[in-house]
């Protein structure tokens, strides 16, 4: 089931106008450093992106009021359009549009002040705790820690950890409905003993969502009654075979608004301005990725590659999962990527001679000056090498969260009864139809083919995969807008935000460099059949404009698979884009020679084949 946005839908009576009569929509995203306003307008019956305004976020001292940054960003929109939006008395926006001024709908997302920071507790690490973790991540939270009976820590260590972390909220799950409740009560008692205090001040009770065994709800309520703001919802795992994260996710969103946001500087005021509840930025981004899956009825893998974090989203057969790698990013967390991946894994993507120490010092400089952008081709290529590793690690982490339910198998031996082996993730690249990327490095790449290859190198798509990215950062804005007016959000997304980069046709399997890998026959728009013979180790671009579709017949060699099994032919409708069709015969997993000279030569061959960078400066660099 797709992540429901019903809990954000508001009674249409609270809107100043019906959605069909709306002319102007304003959406903002209050980020940790920048507040980004996006102004949308219905022109000739079609919703389009009109203009953007940005200003520094004002959550920190001396301002300590987010609405100042919002007003500054909206003022920029006013200056660029001449359209008056703000009330002169500073009481928010003019609502609705009256034919001359104002806006019909205002909504916002926010990640300022650290976003939503949660702690999760469950009974068994690989079962209820894992399901609770998925629910918290799906609600747009950063999960600080997962506490479970079998997490290997002593009770006093858990108490210390809960006390030290100061989360915004806690999610407690455990036990199936009607099962024994003793162990869940033990975890609840640990939480009570720790006396955790909320991050944004001790003036209010820490919100706790209880989504465990419903037969002990009363006992939980009695235990927590004076110290915490308790909300009980349906069990996340009512029976082992079923996961029900939606009620917990809905409660987390509501409490985020009610408790967390209302204590952040200026948010009380901002909440009075908006027509819909404020949504955590990653939840908005996730909803935008779901718009793609929902509209095209496909499996989607999406990524938000940020400066400090990498968010990965998957919608496979309607099941939405989000993961956040809070320590993988392209500016603030860039040295963390180096630490996690290892410098040698970054070096393997660089096609020119450079010392490891030199790369390491460049990345450390980037960390202490996070807002700098690459000034030379050399800088850009080093940054692209890091991006590949951040994306690879982000997906690796995502796969540990997007797993089949554990504890469901019936046939077990006594020895593995309580030992849940990590099961394979259901995110398999051959089943992914669309890859979508957002984030500065991907959105602002000098050439559109660059994100196409970076995402391909990092995630290794197989078979036929469409590649999209955003042109202007507004996925969170469109995600939150879609909760009120889905058709308007999709119209803007489709026409002004979603860039069709092209389609990747990639064969899975390995072979010897130069051996036959696959033959691709493309029936081009003019009716001619273009036949491409691809040898192992080759990669090639076939131009096909955005909006054009061609029939492709792919015949892989007997050890290669393009979706129908090794050596079996596949027919597909292939869609064009700014870069075109990328025929990838480099194999899966990707092979890079151990020998540095051979590796650099092979990388150079791929980069020149795709015209990834300007030819002469690249030739000069790899000499």
Regions found by a protein language model. Name each.
Residues 2-27, 41-48, 54-299, 379-388, ...:
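Nucleotide/phosphate-binding catalytic cleft detector across ATP-hydrolyzing
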Residues 31-33, 112-115, 306:
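Short flexible coil/turn linkers enriched for glycine and charged/polar residues
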Residues 318, 330, 334, 352, ...:
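Short, well-ordered loop/turn and helix-capping segments at boundaries between secondary-structure elements
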Residues 304-307, 314-316, 332, 395, ...:
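Active-site proximal loops enriched in glycine and acidic residues that flank catalytic Cys/His/Asp
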Residues 29-41:
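N-terminal-proximal low-complexity accessory segments that begin disordered
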Residues 352-382:
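A mobile "lid/hinge" subdomain adjacent to the ATP/sugar-phosphate binding pocket shared
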Residues 32-35, 310, 441, 445:
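Conserved protein kinase catalytic core
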Residues 39-58, 287-361, 446-469:
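Glycine-rich phosphate-binding loop of actin/hexokinase-like ATP-binding domains
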């Amino acid at each position: 089931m797709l992540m429901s946005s019903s809990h954000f839908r508001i009674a249409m009576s609270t809107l100043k106008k019906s959605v069909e009569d709306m002319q102007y929509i304003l959406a903002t995203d209050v980020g940790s450093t920048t507040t980004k306003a996006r102004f949308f307008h219905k022109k000739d019956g079609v919703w389009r992106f009109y203009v953007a305004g940005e200003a520094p976020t004002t959550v920190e001292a001396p301002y300590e009021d987010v609405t100042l940054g919002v007003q500054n960003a909206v003022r920029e929109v006013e200056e660029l359009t001449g359209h008056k939006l703000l009330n002169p008395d500073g009481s928010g926006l003019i609502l609705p549009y009256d034919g001359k001024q104002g806006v019909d709908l205002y909504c916002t997302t926010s990640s300022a002040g650290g976003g939503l920071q949660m702690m999760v507790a469950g009974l068994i690490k690989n079962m209820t705790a894992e399901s609770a973790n998925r629910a918290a991540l799906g609600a747009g939270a950063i999960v600080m820690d997962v506490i479970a009976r079998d997490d290997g820590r002593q009770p006093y260590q858990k108490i210390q950890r809960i006390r030290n972390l100061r989360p915004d909220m806690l999610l407690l799950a455990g036990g199936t409905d009607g099962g024994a409740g003793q162990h869940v009560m033990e975890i609840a008692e640990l939480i009570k003993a720790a006396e955790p205090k909320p991050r944004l001040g001790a003036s209010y009770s820490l919100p706790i969502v209880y989504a465990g065994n419903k037969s002990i709800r009363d006992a939980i309520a009695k235990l927590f009654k004076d110290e915490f703001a308790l909300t009980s919802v349906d069990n996340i795992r009512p029976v082992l075979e079923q996961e029900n994260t939606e009620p917990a996710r809905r409660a987390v969103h509501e409490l985020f608004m009610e408790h967390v946001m209302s204590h952040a500087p200026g948010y009380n005021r901002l909440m009075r301005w908006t027509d819909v509840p404020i949504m955590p930025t990653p939840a908005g981004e996730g909803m935008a990725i779901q718009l793609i899956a929902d509209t095209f009825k496909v499996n989607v893998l999406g990524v938000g590659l940020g400066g400090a974090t990498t968010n990965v989203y998957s919608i496979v057969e309607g099941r939405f999962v989000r993961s956040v790698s809070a320590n993988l990013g392209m500016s603030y967390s860039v040295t963390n990527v180096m630490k996690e991946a290892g410098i040698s894994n970054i070096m393997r993507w660089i096609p020119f001679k450079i010392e490891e120490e030199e790369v390491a010092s460049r990345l450390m400089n980037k960390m202490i000056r996070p807002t700098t952008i690459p000034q030379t081709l050399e800088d850009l290529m080093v940054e692209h090498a890091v991006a590949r590793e951040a994306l690879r690690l982000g997906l690796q982490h995502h796969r540990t969260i997007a797993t089949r339910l554990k504890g469901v198998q019936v046939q077990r031996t006594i020895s593995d009864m309580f030992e849940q082996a990590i099961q394979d993730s259901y995110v398999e690249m051959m089943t992914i139809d669309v890859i979508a990327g957002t984030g500065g490095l991907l959105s602002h790449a000098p050439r559109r083919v660059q994100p196409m290859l970076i995402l391909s190198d990092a995630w290794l798509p197989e078979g036929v995969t469409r590649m999209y990215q955003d042109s202007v950062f507004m996925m969170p804005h469109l995600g939150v807008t879609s909760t009120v007016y889905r058709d308007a959000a999709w119209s803007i997304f489709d026409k002004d935000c979603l860039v069709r980069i092209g389609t990747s046709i990639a064969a899975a399997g390995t072979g010897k460099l130069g051996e036959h890998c696959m033959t691709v026959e493309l029936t081009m728009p003019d009716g001619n059949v273009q036949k491409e013979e691809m040898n192992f180790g080759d990669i090639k671009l076939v131009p096909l404009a955005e909006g054009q579709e061609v029939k492709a017949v792919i015949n892989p060699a007997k050890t290669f698979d393009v979706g129908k099994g090794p050596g079996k032919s596949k027919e597909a409708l292939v869609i064009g884009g700014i870069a075109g069709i990328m025929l990838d015969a480099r194999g899966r997993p990707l092979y890079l020679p151990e020998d540095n000279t051979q590796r650099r030569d092979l990388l150079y061959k791929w980069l020149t084949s795709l015209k990834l960078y300007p030819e002469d400066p690249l030739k000069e660099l790899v000499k």
